[in-house]
Amino acid sequence: QAHPQLLLGSMGPIGIEWFAEDSAEYREIRGIAREQAHALLNAGVDGLLIETVTSIRNLQPMLAGARDAADGMPVLVSFVVDDKGDLLGDGLNIEAAVLYAEKHGANSVGVNCCSLAAANAAVPRMVASATTPVTVRPNVGDPVQTQDGPVWHENPEAFARACIEWRHAGAAMVGSCCGTSAITTAAMAEALDRCLACAVYAHP
């Protein structure tokens, strides 16, 4: 049986300073996020994904604008964390970030574009503090800079094993971010299918 395929509309980071909610700058950014969300939803996506969020100041107007346009569609939020599992940009602990996102309407919280070590640190903390599904999508490794740009050294088997560990830790959705090729994606899919088959067999 084929897996259901869902398409999320990605809304990336904006790299702003903090603005008060009643400022013209905040309202402008919120309006831009609203327009982007409208465009993605009109194109037929199944939900909105605000990803690679490094700080709450970046999330605030983006999440508000996305919620303005969502009209019942899910809005997922995904943070970038350091190897301790806290936000890379402002150092806020991941539990507080989860609380803020959920309080302001996020239907799922997670991490992406981080190291495996960062994901390993963040996932159990997020699962323990979140009331919504937790997602995890780290990079496949550390890039090596060459004259032709960054080169990523994949270890599909190790990444697939990590996916199983995140699922066992309580993550609802697992995947990958930068450096991913079809090889790693296939290894993930195979490992997760085996994990699901074993779970179904053990708990009919």
What are the residue ranges of the model-derived segments?
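Domain-level signal for soluble alpha/beta catalytic cores
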Residues: 1-204
